[in-house]
Amino acid sequence: MTQITFPQAGHLTALPPLSLYIHIPWCIKKCPYCDFNSHSLKNGLPEAAYIDALLTDLQLELPNIWGRPVETIFFGGGTPSLFQAESIDRLLSGVRSLLRLQPEAEITLEANPGTFEIEKFQGFKDAGITRLSIGVQSFNDDMLARLGRVHNGKEALTAIATALKLFDKANIDLMYALPNQTVQTALDDVQTAIATGATHISAYHLTMEPNTPFGHTPPKGLPQDEAALDIEDAVHGALEGAGFIHYETSAFAKPTMQCRHNLNYWQFGDYLGIGAGAHGKISYPDRIERTVRRRHPNDYLALMQSQPSKAVERKTVAAEDLPFEFMMNALRLTDGVPAAMLQERTGIPAAKIMAQIETARQKGLLETDPTVFRPTEQGRLFLNDLLQCFL
């Protein structure tokens, strides 16, 4: 890429919206396909100590975000719903005392459909959670067993019904291209999810990630590429036919029900990440900084009790890397983003990367409208090829 230089300090005329990500790293059992920072429960759940550590972590970051309003919060994992509602309440009370949390903030918590967690849903709402994201993956018990999940289809339906009674917004996570899955069995999952009345459905292609059991030994019966593409087309078509807007690579929402937290990621907004292994991105007038917390929960807890600053690594994003990082997020959105947002969020005018933009357009991967960066249908299908234009 052509060498890019920032203007002098003050290149960002305004800071982007700010979100808060909170990582809860424990699960009852780690799934064989999962490459997230999650750890199986072995010796009990150190809830009180971890909440204390999260609040210490947040206090550590206050000078870097002082006075900025927080638009959304997302509890991810791991399985955040393993924590008691009282713990989530204590944490959110601490967050409110430390940050300018917007009155209409979206506050999402990831939950598993086991009956143990369902009993807590009312408590989560009372604590201030406004949206649940339920990790269903499939309603088919055979598929769930192959994926190593600890719930069954009936429990998933009960969890969703309970969530929708309590929350205006609820997401269902589904996976497709599963072992021995056909177009019809994939559609059965999608139609079941649609029938629940969920406002948002995330549909993810099962991938064999390195350093996971499935990555080392893929399960038998995985659909071949062409069959997997047929399944994907059927899944997407069914969701769109039911009135869901396909607004991001894997995300479908009823009108006005998009996940605001994830939209902020994809629009290259800022997010403070706290908790074991959490990543963050914070903009300053003269630079953009990425952060990552110590990954293992035991190490994170120990450092937060003794030397909190040593639990955090900080790195300024090189100016020449910013266009790719911006596009890597923005081009996941079906409608793309306004072209002016590149300069607003990175300080780099589009003119600096016009050669790369023109290459993407000539390949038919990026629309030619100069006011927007929007992938074509071909660009959405071959997103990696589109992103390669900006490397």
Give the predicted meaning of each segment.
Residues 4, 10-19, 38-64, 68-348:
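C-terminal scaffold of the Radical SAM
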Residues 380-391:
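Short, amphipathic alpha-helical interaction segments positioned at domain boundaries
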Residues 347-359:
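Short amphipathic alpha-helical interaction segments
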Residues 25-38:
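Local cysteine-cluster metal-coordination motifs and their immediate loop/turn environment
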Residues 252, 370-373:
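Short, Lys/Arg-rich nucleic-acid/phosphate-binding segment
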Residues 20-24:
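Short active-site neighborhood of thiol/selenol oxidoreductases, capturing the structured segment around
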Residues 373-380:
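Basic, amphipathic "hinge/linker" alpha-helix immediately C-terminal to the N-terminal HTH DNA-binding motif
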Residues 362-371:
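A short, conserved structural fragment
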